[in-house]
């Protein structure tokens, strides 16, 4: 197995300098509670250090950890940590497009990180390692990224990711026919798991490929694939890169994952590797799950309808500290 790097993006939405910069450009952008550019999209729960603790405890084999930020760093971060590389937006995004306040342009350019390995795993900062993982959880022995997927319709939810997924799939289906995708996608392989196979069976006779199911877990990616898609769809990806705030015309990082699936250049992952959770549902039972070791990876999404945010934040930090009490080498 070749070297595997981790890439994670982070923003401190409470930073006054960053807030002033954002306010300068936000203008007519919808930043209401449920919008795609709401405060929730930038909120920091104070749990990011546990992301690093999880990496050190549960994935000590990782080569480098690239932290991508906009001229920011957590106050507790040891920038001299051996495995850490800080990456500023100016290193990967054209200066003409900066500053950006959307994940889409940032994530679409992570392959430009200087020194990044061919094999890397991209994390959002709400995707935590909660039990040991191995390189083979993310890549096959011959270096293919591992995914668990299914045919699944794109959900047209207001303020959701449906627009981005449609744009991603529009590109993918312009290069791969329906029959090629059905052949290459391995949707009916038993290793996908019963739930995924049932989903795919429901939609296999559709005239068109309706979309791929998204697990919301870290994304194993190949730098060469991102370069290839950029070569083929530079104009589209440049438009996304120039999108200062989330825009319905954007593509997102799933495009590169979908390309791997449609081309058949992927291996099937463990369908029980992790799960998606929301802080809307946080309570005693959830905190027990967090510390149970049942899931190796947990994506813990911020919520739109958290009843008592202060209490949830306190409980969240307490539960993470119970799971990962020891300071990591990434901390001062």
Curated annotation (Swiss-Prot):
Top EC class for this record: transferase
Database matches in InterPro entries: Stealth, Stealth_CR1, Stealth_CR2, Stealth_CR3
Keyword terms: Exopolysaccharide synthesis, Transferase
Stretches that traverse the bilayer: none
Gene Ontology molecular function, alphabetical: transferase activity, transferring phosphorus-containing groups
GO BP annotation list: polysaccharide biosynthetic process
Entry annotated with the keyword Transferase: yes
Cross-referenced Pfam families: Stealth_CR1, Stealth_CR2, Stealth_CR3
EC number from the UniProt entry: 2.7.-.-
Other remarks in the entry: Stealth proteins are part of a protein family that is conserved from bacteria to higher eukaryotes. Family members were first identified in microbes as proteins that help pathogens to elude the host innate immune system. Microbial stealth proteins are involved in the biosynthesis of exopolysaccharides. Stealth proteins are predicted to function as hexose-1-phosphoryltransferases.
Family: Belongs to the stealth family.
Protein name listed in UniProt: Receptor polysaccharide phosphotransferase WefC
Source taxonomy: Bacteria, Bacillati, Bacillota, Bacilli, Lactobacillales
